[in-house]
Amino acid sequence: MINIEIIDFRNFAYGKQKKVDDEIYGGGSGMLLKIEPIDLALENTKGKRILLSPQGKPFTQDDALKLSKEENLTFICGRYEGFDERIRNLIDEEYSIGDYVLTGGELASMVIADSTIRLIPGVIKEESYKNDSFQNNLLDYPQYTRPATYKNMNVPEVLLNGNHKEIKQWREQKAYEKTLKNRPDLIERKNNAK
């Protein structure tokens, strides 16, 4: 169902040393990934080309759902100081997984791949992700399992009473409260979507 292929763009570099990076025009610290090896590596790829970068737009659950409908995806993972700017002319999307910098894009590609793959029909049960955090711009409600009491920490009574209408209302309220506390930006996004 899912096939993952790793393409080392060093295999597409010229010269004995197969150099994929070089100094920055105009000066500056660090090395930039060169355009030629990445362009050559991309020539035989299919589907949407995705650049992973802290400069990209924030990756969301909606993006994962959109990507899950694609037949093929190619993730371009950076290293060093970043990419030659012209590489952005070769891509379809540029995503960031957060406001921080990693040593390379490999971890970001795994995060995006995992969140996307789980939404492909047949990978997990649809019910398993329909109520996930972010599905309705809300975080998930608190969930509990046995035992009902552990070291004086109790499962809320409403979850034990069997009244499905009350349980649903409790879950909606708690999801809203958790989102308001931890991610108020999602509440604002939900309100703006109306």
From Swiss-Prot:
Top-level taxon: Bacteria
Pfam families: tRNA_m1G_MT (PF01746)
A GO term for molecular function: tRNA (guanine(37)-N1)-methyltransferase activity
Subcellular location: Cytoplasm
This protein's UniProt keywords: Cytoplasm, Methyltransferase, S-adenosyl-L-methionine, Transferase, tRNA processing
GO annotation (BP), single: tRNA N1-guanine methylation
Known EC number: 2.1.1.228
Keyword Transferase: yes
Classification via SUPFAM superfamilies: alpha/beta knot (SSF75217)
Top EC class of this enzyme: transferase
Ligand binding (S-adenosyl-L-methionine): 78, 97-102
InterPro entries on file: Alpha/beta_knot_MTases, tRNA_m1G_MeTrfase_C_sf, tRNA_m1G_MeTrfase_TrmD, tRNA_m1G_MTases_N, tRNA_MeTrfase_TRMD/TRM10
Major location (coarse): cytoplasm
UniProt xrefs under CDD domains: TrmD-like (cd18080)
Family, similarity comment: Belongs to the RNA methyltransferase TrmD family.
Assembly mode: Homodimer.
Function text: Specifically methylates guanosine-37 in various tRNAs.
Protein known as: tRNA (guanine-N(1)-)-methyltransferase
Gene that this sequence comes from: trmD
